[in-house]
């Protein structure tokens, strides 16, 4: 059995939660390997909706779940999210959930700095969730971070706390903000430590043991390839590497553990927040896509921008993320359109591109070159086999495969877990 790594193939919000939940039923371990609580997952199981942003999707099904060292953790959000799920009768214990001891913490000073920067940015906002993800990663790279393991030694890390606070006080001074209250921060950390430490474990060792037992491991990515800090629409990106290769470093496993890479993509395209979006539709069609697809961010509640499927971006995502197969979601949202468009290139000035150039002004100026195909009137909602799909919907799927140079492995036709068409089992490689 192969391991499976799930990544978003667009700008996030592709429906990874449902697909991961569907796969988690057959996995032995589910691992988050990057990001923080800025990425929302919505699961619908037996008519019950679960919303997660930090915890791996496997917790809902009771699958062993691990938050890897590549994830930045807000301990207070962890507590609140866990309590909310427990109220929905989800069982979460140290036997079913582990947090890497080396995961960096998101502290209140990180989310505050995030907000200070966004407020100062004016009309040039990146569109951050203001949850401190970026500043926490900055401190990790700057070797200032307080990590999960440090919560067991708060009284012994005074010099490190002083260095961290001095750095942030210098930044806060530039924004005209008061210094960090050191005493309060220490007390807050001592208070929350008891919630986190029971789950703190050597995640790399657990995973190594599971691998030796030939367990099926499912790596759950957050955000999407086009939000990757290196390969995305910079600077309108997240603060971590979202591509499949990060599963190795962000979990403590070797590169060979990544296995089958399943990219999740909507049958159209959406984006939350600022940044280039060549196929964005500021018209009735875009509004219809948003209404039918219930396009609001799980974490922020912000309305998502909507547009036609972009095969250029997808082909680029497939290449840089090493995607083996695609899970196509929300096909049912396209039911009833007379015609559907697919972006096959970009025009920037007098030049046509078959990829998205890296310069941000070129990205903003890119105009889509469309191919138009006939739509379908029949409903695809709830379909669980190819025979239930309209012929024109199948034609649309096949055309996407040709354009992105990657096979469609799964098709999702509703938020319900079982409304999924399996073309190829990712766990079989």
From Swiss-Prot:
It catalyses: IMP + L-aspartate + GTP = N(6)-(1,2-dicarboxyethyl)-AMP + GDP + phosphate + 2 H(+). Coiled coil: none annotated. The keyword Cytoplasm applies. It is found in: Cytoplasm. The active site is at 13 (proton acceptor), 41 (proton donor). PANTHER family: ADENYLOSUCCINATE SYNTHETASE. Belongs to the adenylosuccinate synthetase family. Plays an important role in the de novo pathway of purine nucleotide biosynthesis. Catalyzes the first committed step in the biosynthesis of AMP from IMP. This is Adenylosuccinate synthetase. It comes from Zymomonas mobilis subsp. mobilis (strain ATCC 31821 / ZM4 / CP4).
